[in-house]
């Protein structure tokens, strides 16, 4: 029996309308009744996730910013990882050949240089939103991550530019087909979950995890039981071909799987 369950949010626990379904909420409550520790492992900001947990009265650990922050049930900061100031400066000040929008994160929030209302659709559940700033005036010493949002082919070309400029000084990953992230070296959900399990006196073998994108790769590959969403990025399925694939987030597939796991643990599972 797993002792900790870690969940990605977008494309995994959240439905396509960016809400948590009632079946999902009910299943999370059942896990807590079984004394299974809940952990939300997401690229979203800690401020947003703390608001969501408060609104739902959920007790859960938080891995946010794709591993840049880990918080306890009480909101205590257990782990932090920031981009080196020189890396943040290069990414912010360089003229990149891209049409993608740039987004900067630190403990105070989400910042960008121009309005992009379409992006806010993903935050209707929480009301979290960006702040408009002069990117060149952004404090460089506290940047957790930098994201580029746009067309996937354009971002793939940008990834090459970033790698040529940064080399091994940053970790680049796609958190979605339309979002490329620049993170501190060694920073990912799997590394953050390792920190959390050590804090809790658990091993990664005691954990199950669910995800759909390349920013979930290390987490899914390191736990005792990793599960890939049916709507996952093809690259993730190719990287972890040995992991089982469950259903689509629109059908609350995580809840579907966990209900079976709780009720019929000795029977084989089918996502149908």
Swiss-Prot record:
Mg(2+) binds at residues 8, 10, 212. It catalyses: 4-amino-2-methyl-5-(diphosphooxymethyl)pyrimidine + H2O = 4-amino-2-methyl-5-(phosphooxymethyl)pyrimidine + phosphate + H(+). The active site is at residue 8. It comes from the Bacteria. Its cofactor is Mg(2+). Its EC number is 3.6.1.-. Belongs to the HAD-like hydrolase superfamily. Cof family. NCBIfam families: Cof-subfamily, HAD-SF-IIB, PRK15126.1. Catalyzes the hydrolysis of 4-amino-2-methyl-5-hydroxymethylpyrimidine pyrophosphate (HMP-PP) to 4-amino-2-methyl-5-hydroxymethylpyrimidine phosphate (HMP-P). This is HMP-PP phosphatase. It comes from Escherichia coli O6:H1 (strain CFT073 / ATCC 700928 / UPEC).
């Amino acid at each position: 029996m797993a002792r900790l369950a870690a969940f990605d949010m977008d494309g995994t626990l959240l439905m396509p309308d960016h809400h948590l379904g009632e079946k999902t909420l009910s299943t999370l409550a059942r896990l807590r009744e079984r004394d299974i520790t809940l952990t939300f492992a997401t690229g979203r900001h800690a401020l947003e996730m703390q608001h969501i947990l408060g609104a739902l009265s959920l007790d859960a650990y938080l891995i946010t910013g794709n591993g840049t922050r880990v918080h306890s049930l009480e909101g205590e900061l257990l782990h932090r990882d920031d981009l080196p100031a020189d890396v943040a400066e290069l990414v912010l000040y360089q003229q990149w050949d891209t049409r993608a929008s740039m987004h900067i994160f630190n403990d105070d929030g989400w910042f960008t240089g121009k309005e992009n209302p379409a992006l806010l659709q993903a935050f209707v559940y929480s009301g979290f939103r960006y702040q408009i700033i002069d990117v060149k005036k952004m404090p460089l010493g506290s940047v957790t991550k930098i994201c580029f949002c746009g067309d996937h082919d354009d971002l793939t070309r940008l990834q090459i530019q970033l790698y040529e400029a940064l080399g091994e000084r940053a970790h680049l990953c796609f958190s979605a087909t339309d979002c490329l992230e620049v993170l501190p070296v060694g920073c990912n959900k799997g590394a953050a979950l390792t920190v959390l399990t050590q804090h809790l006196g658990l091993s990664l073998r005691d954990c199950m995890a669910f995800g759909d994108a390349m920013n979930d790769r290390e987490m899914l590959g390191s736990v005792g039981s990793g599960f890939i969403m049916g709507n996952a990025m093809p690259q993730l399925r190719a990287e972890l071909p040995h992991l089982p694939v469950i259903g689509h987030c629109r059908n609350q597939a995580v809840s579907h799987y966990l209900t079976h796991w709780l009720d019929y643990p000795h029977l084989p599972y089918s996502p149908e």
